[in-house]
From Swiss-Prot:
Keyword NAD: no
Organism ancestry: Bacteria, Bacillati, Bacillota, Bacilli, Bacillales
Protein name: Phosphoribosylformylglycinamidine cyclo-ligase
PANTHER family recorded: TRIFUNCTIONAL PURINE BIOSYNTHETIC PROTEIN ADENOSINE-3 (PTHR10520:SF12), TRIFUNCTIONAL PURINE BIOSYNTHETIC PROTEIN ADENOSINE-3-RELATED (PTHR10520)
Source species: Geobacillus kaustophilus (strain HTA426)
Keyword set includes Ligase: yes
Amino acid sequence: MAKAYKQAGVDIEAGYQAVALMKEHVQKTMRPEVLGGIGGFGGLFDLSALGYRQPVLISGTDGVGTKLKLAFLLDRHDTIGIDCVAMCVNDIIVQGAEPLFFLDYIACGKAVPEKIAAIVKGVADGCVEAGCALIGGETAEMPGMYDEDEYDLAGFAVGVAEKERLITGETIQAGDALVGLPSSGLHSNGYSLVRRIVFEQAKLSLDEIYEPLDVPLGEELLKPTRIYAKLLRSVRERFTIKGMAHITGGGLIENIPRMLPPGIGARIQLGSWPILPIFDFLREKGSLEEEEMFSVFNMGIGLVLAVSPETAAPLVEWLSERGEPAYIIGEVAKGAGVSFAGGGRA
């Protein structure tokens, strides 16, 4: 079957095998609103079953970036899909969305069924964590575009919010508090710089455990991006959140202003949260200035919530009681941009 196509580098049978292997992973993500199964031309989702009065759909798309290069080097592909889901889902939940469904796109040089299934397993694990269904996707074998052992991964998330429950940041004002939720590590940003530091400047091994890390460097760098969807759902049932920012590329400096009204900025108190060891490690090995660290990496904060001053302490206490660390990391201030004060360590 398709002998000439296979000779040209596209193995249709391998694609069929990959689909068969991924089915069990996809199935565990299903929600009652999903109509039909995988294999159709499009994924179907019954929005009316949710009972929203004025539903607003919120969508996002993203990839994993050059973190994929580390997955290639370590030949580990079962968690990178979690990163893909996290990058998309975290972007829509900060606007008030309940994640509904997800689609993935994998482009590769050679379709190895077991590898594709491992990637999709990670995507499915991320979807379960986010509470959304994996209702479709595309795996494209593209010889000549990618090396045989390389691939790219992107995703698309769609969520819904009641119109009156959208989080727009419009009510944020000077004096409001900024509460930070910890990241799990680097998440999925800054990896071009990370690879330059690790491989070109410091010439490190991914298999070694370096001080102050407690796992091999490769394992630390591949830690999946944290997904905040279920936690935020619980938070919003009890507290009023004025605005939220997903701390991705550009760090606190670039992402906090995205949730703020015009003419309003933020003052961050350094030392108000613990900096994860991986950031100190990279700063030392790369001889980086603190300003650049904060403009590239999340520095241990994956999500920032803007709340009224009287809400901040009860929110942090409530989270702490449930084993979820959170920190009051600063406040909203007049004037544009993000400034830093203080120092030391939390």
